[in-house]
Each structure stands twice: as structure tokens, then as C-alpha cells.
Curated annotation (Swiss-Prot):
Native source species: Angiopteris evecta
Protein known as: Translation initiation factor IF-1, chloroplastic
PROSITE patterns: S1_IF1_TYPE
Gene name in the database record: infA
Keywords noted in UniProt: Chloroplast, Initiation factor, Plastid, Protein biosynthesis, RNA-binding, rRNA-binding
Localization (cell): Plastid, Chloroplast
SMART domains for this protein: S1 (SM00316)
Principal subcellular localization: plastid
Alphabetized InterPro entries for the sequence: NA-bd_OB-fold, RNA-binding_domain_S1_IF1, S1_domain, TIF_IF1
Length: 89
């Protein structure tokens, strides 16, 4: 599959699962099961619930994806977790 066939979306990590898997809530409201790309794994980038990430989806299966980038936090320390918790409730 070519790189241009993939769909890029942004979302928030809602849950950390075993084996470096994460559940991500996309901006359109869909829940996606994702894993970490090789570059993130090699560079030891830590991804936690509440982090904003860029996800790459295959057009063949829109329920699974790959986290390709962790976006910078727009808020001061601690506020993003509060926003995340209020969003979940």
C-alpha cells in the first residue's frame, strides 16, 4: 500500500493497553485501536492517556491505526489531564 493511500487524523489517547496498544478517540468521535510506529518506539517517546496524537489509518480497516506523531501540549502542565477527564465524563 502506498503512503498516499493512508488517512491521517488527529485524536486524544483515552486508554493505554498492553503490548504498546492504545485506544484513541479521534476528532470526529470514532474510537480506534492503535499501535506505535517504529520511529516513536526507537526514540523512546512516551505516550500517555490525555496526549494528543496524529494517527494513520488504512482505508481498508478504519478501526485500527498507527500512532505516527505525538503533538505538543498546548496547555500548561496539568491542565490537559483535567480537560481530558472532563471530556470523558
Amino acid at each position: 500500500m502506498k503512503k498516499q493511500d493512508l488517512i491521517d487524523m488527529e485524536g486524544i489517547v483515552t486508554e493505554s493497553l498492553p503490548n504498546a496498544m492504545f485506544r484513541v478517540c479521534l476528532d470526529n468521535g470514532c474510537q480506534v485501536l492503535t499501535h506505535i510506529s517504529g520511529k516513536i518506539r526507537r526514540n523512546y517517546i512516551r505516550i500517555l492517556p490525555g496526549d494528543r496524537v496524529r494517527v494513520e489509518l488504512s482505508p481498508y480497516d478504519l478501526t485500527k491505526g498507527r500512532i505516527i506523531y505525538r503533538l505538543r501540549n498546548k496547555y500548561p502542565n496539568g491542565i490537559s489531564q483535567e480537560v481530558f477527564r472532563s471530556m470523558r465524563d
